[in-house]
Amino acid sequence: MKLWKIGITAALLSLGAAFGASAQSALNEILDSGTLKVGTTGDWNPMTLKDPATNSYKGYDIDIMTELAKDLGVEVEFVPTDWKTLVNGVVAGKYHLTGSASISAARMKVAGFSDSYIAVEIVPFTTKDKADRFDGTDSINKADVKVATTLGTSFEKMVRDWYPDADIKVVEAPARGFQEVIAGRADVFITSNIEGSTLEAKFPVTRVKNVEAPSSTPIAMIMPQADQVWINYVNNWIELKKGEGFFEATREKWGL
């Protein structure tokens, strides 16, 4: 009887040790390795923008992640990714979290999110020479209107939900929907009010008249779904930095 009890105890201890090893938080890995790995697309100005000449990044996200790494006492490594594989990179452990991404039900099925620290409105844009053609959502949701979007993005799902009768053109990253519209290969694209303002300053595009954003879209970091230790750390860090005015100052720096 005593031998049976000893055997059971040993088995439970072995299982507990194995569970503890497999359940080690990304936080421990980051602190042990001295590196915070961040997945970023480098194509969402002014959130994250990659300079192909230097392979360096700049933007709102980049400042946030650099600050997070600094407070962790580690270096930051930006790992290139694209929108269609952004979530997969977190799930596969290629990086510890992502830069800013919209919170969606589809993404929540397989990944976790930090608390939101900024929100955006998603609205349609067209070129200035076509501005008079569009007035309201119904003017876009037609078979003779080509709406461009990027594969695997939350924008793709929104386009399909909002404009089911339109001719939807899906392009793969690094191509972007707005590029198709500027090149004359599509009529309308959707993007955040943040990126839209940047594009309006650089290209002959304009917001479609009389279309209100359905609602604000919360933005957060995508994180490993089961790693509550890491999620708790980041959420508390976000709350702390909000109190210090860091997020507000960073928004002002990038004109958000």
Go through each PLM region and give its residues.
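Ligand-binding clefts/hinges and TM-proximal coupling segments of bilobed small-molecule sensing domains
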Residues: 25, 154-169, 209-210, 238-256
